[in-house]
């Protein structure tokens, strides 16, 4: 069984985990089936929530921090809490807005989580360890594609990237985590600024924020958008509201976070991505290689006999030999 603390939201306080010396990792669910999830939760739960339940069960995850990002994740918390299997299960309430009052409340909730982390890890908060985890990812330079929408995970990102010659920027709800730096300090002094930094990120769709605040997800170098939705998602499934403002080519795709999407259903997804790449003149070189030169002097004849139960064919070269 894994002792790693897992998380499923960009508002999860990773720097706080690091401050307590915890090992942590993002959930990246891709379910083989939903048999476990549908036994203990409703079948109409969104695919991502069901895939989270499957990963927790199949991987033996026993430490998990969730947020109240949507009703589906609240149900995931309820199911896991009722199972009695979790060693460390925390639900972090995340405000829908960033105001002085919500930031103060969020700091108090972070303090409660910090106390739980101290009990679980047996370590004191180390401000330098927390500060060392503030990492800023360099932004893509030059023309690129932007992957927007709901969580897609590593398999979806790789699938999209393989279809395009251009770099793909993951700006999905779990792919665009970036915090302003917070100076190292004692826990009580660290948490107010840290709460503000977490809530100051580019807002996801569940946050009460104007569309203009999300505009920075798509910069002037974006040539096209792949907008990902998950079946039954509360926030990203209803429609293409955000991407329409950018006046860029948009491809909308939907998955259910199952492996079947990329196997038996993967042909349709690949075909749509390939067609979109072709429309943007961004087909990878492996698909743009010139065909071998034809021998125009060669002459062949073909005969085809098609019946009700079978079809036979024969090809002869110019000397009459069967090829």
Model segments located where?
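Short glycine-aspartate micro-motif
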Residues: 301-305
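An N-terminal assembly and electron-transfer interface module characteristic of large anaerobic redox
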Residues: 1-300
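Short glycine-rich, Thr/Ser-proximal phosphate-binding strand/loop in the N-terminal lobe
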Residues: 306-323
């Amino acid at each position: 069984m894994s002792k790693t603390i897992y998380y499923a939201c960009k508002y999860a306080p990773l720097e706080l985990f690091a401050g307590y010396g915890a090992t942590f990792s993002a959930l990246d669910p891709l379910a083989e089936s939903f048999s476990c999830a549908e036994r203990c939760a409703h079948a109409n739960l969104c695919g991502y929530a069901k895939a989270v339940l499957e990963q927790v069960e199949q991987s033996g995850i026993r430490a998990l921090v969730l947020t109240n990002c949507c009703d589906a994740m609240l149900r995931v918390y309820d199911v896991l809490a009722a199972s009695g299997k979790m060693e460390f299960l925390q639900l972090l309430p995340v405000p829908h807005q960033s105001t002085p009052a919500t930031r103060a409340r969020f700091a108090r909730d972070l303090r409660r989580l910090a106390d739980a982390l101290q009990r679980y890890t047996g370590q004191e908060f180390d401000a330098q360890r927390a500060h060392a985890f503030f990492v800023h990812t360099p932004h893509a330079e030059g023309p690129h594609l932007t992957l927007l929408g709901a969580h897609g995970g590593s398999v979806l990102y790789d699938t999209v990237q393989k279809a395009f010659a251009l770099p793909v920027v993951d700006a999905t709800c779990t792919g665009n985590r970036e915090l302003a730096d917070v100076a190292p300090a004692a826990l009580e002094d660290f948490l107010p600024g840290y709460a503000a930094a977490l809530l100051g990120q580019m807002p996801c769709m569940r946050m009460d924020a104007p569309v203009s605040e999300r505009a920075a997800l798509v910069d002037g170098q974006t040539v096209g958008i792949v907008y990902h939705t998950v079946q039954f998602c509360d926030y990203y499934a209803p429609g293409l509201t955000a991407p329409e403002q950018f006046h860029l080519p948009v491809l909308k795709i939907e998955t259910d976070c199952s492996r079947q999407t990329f196997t038996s259903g993967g042909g349709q997804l690949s075909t749509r991505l390939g067609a979109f790449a072709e429309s943007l003149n961004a087909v990878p070189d492996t698909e743009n290689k010139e065909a071998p030169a034809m021998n125009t002097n060669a002459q062949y004849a073909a005969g085809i006999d098609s019946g009700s139960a079978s079809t036979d064919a024969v090809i002869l070269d110019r000397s009459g030999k069967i090829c």
